[in-house]
Amino acid sequence: MKNGKNNKGKRRKPRHQRDNRERKPTFTDEDIVSKEELESGNNLISLPELRTKSISELQTTAESMNIVNLARARRQDITFSILKAHAAEDHPIFGEGVLEILQDGFGFLRSSDSSYLAGPDDVYVSPNQIRKFNLHTGDTVSGSVRPPKDNERYFALLKVAEINFEEPEN
């Protein structure tokens, strides 16, 4: 009871009004990369393209990059080694996938090759990027990717090139 009145059956007013309008993206030119800019870079390697290669083709690519001891390695390990060696020489890596946002706020770009299931070659998308670009689960995102640092397990999205096959607009 408040002020001697019975509030039974009455709806409480919300403490604050929630703004249901879509937020405008607030990203800068440093957050995006054009597809032409990516493709113009020397020695661009594409993660989706590597996923389609056979194991023998991957081993040939690895040998040409002087990566050794991959004779009995799994496909994912060979791909991971190729990408890591490629990035060590400061060459760009192109990644693409369908975004799945987890409850913690971050997300992963999943591949149709793995039926959109979690895998070691998924690309991590930070909560900050998800907010900046107003991304949602199911969006197709592509861009430049960096290899995992020492304490990380996944490749990470550096810059966004396209969202749902269109360049992001500010």
State where each predicted segment sits.
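P-loop NTP-binding catalytic core
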Residues: 135, 148-170
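Conserved small-residue-rich
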Residues: 131
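Short beta-strand micro-motifs enriched in acidic
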Residues: 102, 146-148
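Loop/turn positions that initiate beta-strands
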Residues: 138-140
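Charged, low-complexity terminal tails
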Residues: 1-125, 134
